[in-house]
């Protein structure tokens, strides 16, 4: 679990270190809302939002990713204090 205040920092740190096609998943404590980040290429990411709204953000660079995560943090996790955090590795 990660603190909501560390959400963006942990997400950005993790996506830089995962392999291409791996995903990072963040869920609320109740696990009813989630944000999933997929690394599609070096420096390019897809973000899917599944919770209050369902939306997909495609081909984001690191700067756009940070901006999108700030937006999603306010929208999907407004009252959350802790988030479940999981790295989903693709099989080779």
Model feature map: region roles:
Residues 1-28, 51-74, 87, 91-92:
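Negatively charged, low-complexity tracts enriched in Asp/Glu with abundant Ser/Thr
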Residues 40, 49-52:
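Surface loops and adjacent helix of pleckstrin homology
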